[in-house]
Amino acid sequence: MKTTSSQPRAIYYVVALQIWEYFSFYGMRALLILYLTNQLKYDDNHAYALFSAYCSLVYVTPILGGYLADKLLGNRMAVMLGALLMAIGHLVLGASETAPVFLYLSLAIIVCGYGLFKSNVSCLLGELYEPADPRRDGGFSLMYAAGNIGSIIAPIACGYVQEEYSWAMGFALAAIGMVAGLVIFLCGNRHFQHTAGVNRQALCARRFLLPNWGWLLVLLVTAPLLIAVLFWQEWSVYALIVATVIGLAVLARIYLRAETDKQRKDLRLIVVLTAFSLLFWAFAQQGGSSISLYIDRFVNRHIMSYEVPTAMFQSVNAFAVMLCGMVLAWLVKESVGGNRTVRIWGKFALGLGLMSAGFCILTLSARWSAAYGQSSMPLMVLGLAVMGFAELFIDPVAMSQITRIEIPGVTGVLTGIYMLLSGAIANYLAGVIADQTSQASFDAAGAVNYSIDAYIKVFSQITWGALACVGVVLVIWLYHSLKVRTRRLAVE
């Protein structure tokens, strides 16, 4: 390939696929908790448990998806197969109104598809560049920005279709989006000829009684069924425990094999950053569960005579990420000097502080609802926007530190462990937190009366919890700042 200032043509097909994958995933996610409570009439406890189990397992399966791509399928085939499975899953989800058994199966199919897609689309993009190609960073930035476009549009479009037509049509729109992305991607197939394809030799090699392609088919059939059983029996927590134990064991092994003090110091930093990221995302993931139900029940969503669908509020977060990303880029540019560790903790303190501020606004909103029956929509939008801005100071900072580690061959493993803890485990904890809002009573007619006091309590506790994290992070920041200052004075 020639290295020019323009991007490889293949990237635009990857970007299109990424837009539609985000559209599909976040469109469905915006509807799911509302579908479980409003349409299937699940109580809040059951809905939160299933929602958090689903959001947790989508961060576990990419580990297996990456392995299958490396050994058998190649990134391109894995991505296409994952997109197809997600589209099928969304269609099956629409049928769960008439046959509830399809609910667990559909979520399991989506989890499997996400595992094949998410772990490999970035690797496929990386294959488009030579290792030293200066266009690489720009390509990844383009894909990230494009994904946010999809996640902004999806809740608006799917929420509108669900409100005007049906839940099944809302989920079908998510499926159509995924199919559209896959068709566009296939149209550019000729631009991916230089990327790694299916490993035919490995597929045909026999292992035990079957060739590997036979075992792959068995896996594609049994994995969704097994995951569906995990959802049905509420056993997903056991899968998370096993994955976490394995992840921590691998992390300990990497630490013990580190050769220098600097490597061990960097690993300790990553571990502490991951712990704070886990707490941050346990708070932030309330957006798809407890916050969504709070908006549906206690926020005045009317603009003139039009009632804004609850699902549309999920777009606020993605829009804030895109808009405030430019501010973050300026902040990074203006603060390139100084000690890197000090900057890292400063950004984490800012991110957690913004999360606390966002939930403080939500607490005020909930108190307003308690006093006047309903809260105002602008106050809700402000709180969600502040929380979206907070995200920019957490994940990018932690991921940047992981990629800087000077231990050969562990970056991918550390990234997977980070996603497991800050993704899967954080989503499980988010479900535990959200469950504290599921306090309700019944009136004489049998109608459900939801407790606004429960939302006030949970939002307030998160506000103070995030603020406590800020205090701890500031102590760490101050320690490193004084350490750097002392070192400079000693040199002078």
Curated annotation (Swiss-Prot):
Primary localization: membrane
Keyword Transmembrane in record: yes
InterPro entries linked: AA/pep_transptr_DtpD, Dipep/tripep_permease, MFS_dom, MFS_trans_sf, MFS_Transporters, POT_fam, PTR2_symporter_CS
Keyword Protease (UniProt): no
Subcellular location: Cell inner membrane
UniProt membrane topology term: Multi-pass membrane protein
PROSITE patterns from the UniProt entry: MFS (PS50850), PTR2_1 (PS01022), PTR2_2 (PS01023)
Keywords: Cell inner membrane, Cell membrane, Membrane, Peptide transport, Protein transport, Transmembrane, Transmembrane helix, Transport
Bilayer-crossing regions: 14-34, 49-69, 91-111, 138-158, 167-187, 212-232, 236-256, 269-289, 312-332, 344-364, 379-399, 413-433, 458-478
One GO BP: protein transport
One Pfam family, short name: PTR2
A cellular component annotation (GO) from this entry: plasma membrane
General function of this protein: Probable proton-dependent permease that transports dipeptides.
The family this protein is said to belong to: Belongs to the major facilitator superfamily. Proton-dependent oligopeptide transporter (POT/PTR) (TC 2.A.17) family. DtpD subfamily.
Name of the protein this chain belongs to: Dipeptide permease D
Species the sequence originates in: Klebsiella pneumoniae (strain 342)
Species classification: Bacteria, Pseudomonadati, Pseudomonadota, Gammaproteobacteria, Enterobacterales
